[in-house]
């Protein structure tokens, strides 16, 4: 089950718990977080966590709502798991891009 995180302390707590239990953590942004917090904020959060918790297995899913532009920006910034609920044609194009950069696009 994914843990919804909206701050660095929340993400750290979830990863510390996963680290102590020896399991992988599934982190997920709140709905429409790319619009609310910004893609760059979550990209920096992801980079900080990858550095701080280098030995801990985790995924971070950024919810981009129906905004294809934000989903594309998230892929450009290196976020590896994007939630997108927009137009099916946009989803197909984004999925193709995600595959090329080793990322994953998931529906809502």
Task: Walk through the language-model features, giving the residues of each.
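Active-site-adjacent beta->alpha loops and helix N-cap segments on the catalytic face
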Residues: 9-13, 17, 34-46, 86-100
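N-terminal active-site wall of soluble small-molecule enzyme domains
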Residues: 29-75
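Generic secondary-structure signature for well-ordered alpha-helical cores
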Residues: 19-23, 47-51, 99, 103
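A short acidic, glycine/proline-enriched capping/turn motif at secondary-structure boundaries
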Residues: 66-69, 81, 89-90
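Short, charged N-terminal helix-start/capping segments
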Residues: 1-23, 74
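Hydrophobic faces of well-ordered beta-strands that scaffold small-molecule active sites
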Residues: 1-6, 23-29, 58-64, 81-84, ...
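Amphipathic protein-protein interaction modules
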Residues: 71-82, 96-104
């Amino acid at each position: 089950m994914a843990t919804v995180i909206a701050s660095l302390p929340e993400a750290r707590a979830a990863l510390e718990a996963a680290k102590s239990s020896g399991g992988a953590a599934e982190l997920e942004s709140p709905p429409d977080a790319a619009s609310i917090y910004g893609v760059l904020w979550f990209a920096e959060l992801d980079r900080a966590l990858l550095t701080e918790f280098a030995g801990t297995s985790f995924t971070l899913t950024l919810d981009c709502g129906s905004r294809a532009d934000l989903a594309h920006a998230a892929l450009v910034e290196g976020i590896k798991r994007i939630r997108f609920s927009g137009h099916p044609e946009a989803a197909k194009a984004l999925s193709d891009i995600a595959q090329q950069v080793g990322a994953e696009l998931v529906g809502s």
